[in-house]
């Protein structure tokens, strides 16, 4: 390996989708927003389709248009809805907006004119307080159900606040509120579970699940072993190793000081490549399965490690940042963030290697 390399395994993503589909009684979609969580929708979406996935979700209209070019027959939902004035574009490309307000419903209905409205989703906010019908709008629809006529609605959906915390009271509260609303519109199918929601038990089953993070190898059950296959590995070769004396410092502002004569290895990856600067003096990487700690602050293009305890390590040897010995969730925990952020931040300077199926 001569360059920092991000290895992507579309076969693992497909296998993860199949595993989730096997445990769910309803349909399982694939969430491929943010360029398939940074791994490349052009690579991941066809792999999911080949595995049997027929419904997909993205966040924006532009993402949906790109996905439509890849998958002409797929059912594509747009989570952020239809931008005002773009109803014609979405209708022409058979894209399905997630309607999250009465105003959005009115625009979508109005754009249909005398034609039959293309399919769409209705989004009920049950506690996230971002997008979706609020309590007053939901009550208004219950009182005036004909407002849903002409929208082409297929599903009502909501988004769980804390599905990765099985004991969180919000889970049951959201499920109950969602069920009460959905019961008023029994002709609509339901969509409730995200990745972690699929592991909350039968009470969280629905007609359509929407996993994202778990597809890419993230752990949907943080309090238990990860049931998913890893989909990425991140590694970089050592550029240089330097010997320093006891008392010398490494990196900007000298935040790491050698307590003994030490050897410092430098790799050509930094925060410009998506490694959070919060990993400074916290990251642990792997060399031939052995733990090596970061030394000092991460730079824009470089990261340094203390390899004093490994006299055989040499320039050109490969440092594993994310891989079997240190998965995406462990890496994210050291950074004080979540794996979602890490995945979607990995930059364009890596050599991207696609693992063959």
Curated annotation (Swiss-Prot):
- Tree of life domain: Bacteria
Residue positions of the active site: 33, 252
Q: In the record, what terms sit under GO molecular function?
A: alanine racemase activity; pyridoxal phosphate binding
Q: Which residues carry this modification: N6-(pyridoxal phosphate)lysine?
A: 33
One GO term (biological process): D-alanine biosynthetic process
Q: Which Pfam families does the annotation name?
A: Ala_racemase_C, Ala_racemase_N
Q: What class of enzyme is it?
A: isomerase
Q: What is its EC number?
A: 5.1.1.1
One GO term of the cellular component aspect?
cytosol
Q: What does the similarity note say?
A: Belongs to the alanine racemase family.
Q: State the protein's name.
A: Alanine racemase
- UniProt lists the gene as alr
């Amino acid at each position: 390996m001569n360059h920092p390399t991000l290895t992507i395994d579309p076969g693992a993503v497909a296998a993860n989708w199949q595993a989730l589909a096997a445990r769910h009684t309803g349909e399982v979609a694939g969430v491929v927003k943010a360029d398939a969580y940074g791994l490349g929708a052009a690579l991941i979406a066809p792999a999911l389709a080949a595995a049997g996935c027929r419904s997909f979700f993205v966040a924006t209209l532009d993402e949906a248009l790109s996905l439509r070019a890849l998958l002409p027959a797929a059912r594509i939902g747009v989570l952020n809805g239809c931008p005002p004035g773009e109803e014609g574009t979405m209708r022409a490309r058979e894209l399905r907006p997630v309607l999250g307000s009465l105003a959005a419903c009115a625009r979508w209905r109005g754009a249909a004119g005398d034609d039959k409205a293309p399919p769409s989703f209705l989004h009920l906010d049950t506690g996230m307080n971002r997008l979706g019908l609020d309590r007053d709008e939901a009550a208004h629809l219950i009182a005036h159900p004909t407002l849903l006529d002409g929208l082409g609605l297929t599903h009502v959906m909501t988004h769980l606040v804390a599905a990765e915390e099985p004991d969180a009271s919000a889970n049951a509260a959201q499920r109950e509120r969602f069920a009460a609303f959905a019961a008023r519109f029994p002709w609509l199918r339901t969509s409730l579970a995200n990745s972690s929601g699929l592991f909350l038990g039968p009470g969280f089953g629905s007609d359509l699940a929407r996993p994202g993070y778990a597809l890419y190898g993230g752990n949907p059950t943080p309090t238990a072993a990860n049931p998913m296959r890893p989909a990425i590995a991140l590694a970089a070769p050592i550029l240089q190793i330097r010997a320093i004396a006891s008392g010398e410092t490494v990196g900007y502002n000298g935040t790491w000081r050698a307590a003994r004569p030490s050897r410092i290895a430098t790799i050509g990856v930094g925060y410009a490549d998506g490694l959070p600067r919060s990993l400074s003096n916290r990251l642990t990487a792997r060399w031939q399965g052995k733990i090596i700690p970061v030394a000092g602050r991460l730079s824009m293009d470089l990261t340094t490690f203390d390899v004093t305890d490994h006299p055989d390590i040499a320039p050109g040897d490969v440092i594993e940042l994310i891989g079997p010995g240190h998965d995406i969730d462990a890496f994210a925990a050291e950074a004080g963030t979540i794996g979602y952020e890490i995945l979607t931040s990995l930059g364009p300077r890596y050599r991207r290697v696609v693992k063959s199926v």
